[in-house]
């Protein structure tokens, strides 16, 4: 669920998810869309959106899943039918960490509208 995803991001990158990733670029935040992702961080959100689109029959934002930390690694459980949601969230949190160097404050609360055409997954 969204709360668990936020906790993963906070622990992985050490930043509060909402102010830093809640409205970043074209794809971070609710209803991402537009042209090519702005940078590596925005691409993490784009890939996360694509991952969610591939899931069927699972409520993406409110389905709780099991996960844990093994040393510094997120480990998703395997006990629920919608555990793939955890894998999408885990991959995005790791991607944010790997792309901390691409984070650009000019894309935070990005007010310039992104093109309406969907960039293909």
Curated annotation (Swiss-Prot):
Keywords recorded for this protein, A-Z: Calcium, Disulfide bond, Hydrolase, Lipid degradation, Lipid metabolism, Metal-binding, Myotoxin, Neurotoxin, Secreted, Toxin
pH dependence: Optimum pH is 8.0.
Pfam hit, one: Phospholip_A2_1
Active site: 48, 89
Tissue localization of expression: Expressed by the venom gland.
Compartments, record wording: Secreted
GO biological process: arachidonate secretion; lipid catabolic process; negative regulation of T cell proliferation; phospholipid metabolic process
Binding site for Ca(2+): 27, 29, 31, 49
Summary of activators and inhibitors of this protein: Inhibited by magnesium, cadmium and manganese ions. Also inhibited by crotapotin.
Disulphides: 26-114, 28-45, 44-95, 50-121, 51-88, 58-82, 76-86
Keyword Lipid metabolism found: yes
UniProt cofactor(s): Ca(2+)
Temperature remarks: Optimum temperature is 35-45 degrees Celsius.
InterPro entries: PLipase_A2, PLipase_A2_Asp_AS, PLipase_A2_dom, PLipase_A2_dom_sf, PLipase_A2_His_AS
Top EC group: hydrolase
Cofactor descriptive note: Binds 1 Ca(2+) ion.
Catalytic reaction annotation: a 1,2-diacyl-sn-glycero-3-phosphocholine + H2O = a 1-acyl-sn-glycero-3-phosphocholine + a fatty acid + H(+)
Family that this chain belongs to: Belongs to the phospholipase A2 family. Group II subfamily. D49 sub-subfamily.
Name of the protein: Basic phospholipase A2 BmTX-I
């Amino acid at each position: 669920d969204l709360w668990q995803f936020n906790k993963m991001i906070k622990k992985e990158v050490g930043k509060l998810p909402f102010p830093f990733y809640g409205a970043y670029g074209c794809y971070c935040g609710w209803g991402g869309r537009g042209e090519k992702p702005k940078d590596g961080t925005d691409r993490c959100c784009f890939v996360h959106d694509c991952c969610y689109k591939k899931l069927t029959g699972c409520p993406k934002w409110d389905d709780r899943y099991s996960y844990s930390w093994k040393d510094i690694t997120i480990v998703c459980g395997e006990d629920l039918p919608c555990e793939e949601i955890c894998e999408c969230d885990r991959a995005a949190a790791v991607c944010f960490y790997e792309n901390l160097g691409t984070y650009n404050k000019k894309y935070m609360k990005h007010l310039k509208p992104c093109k309406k055409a969907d960039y293909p997954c």
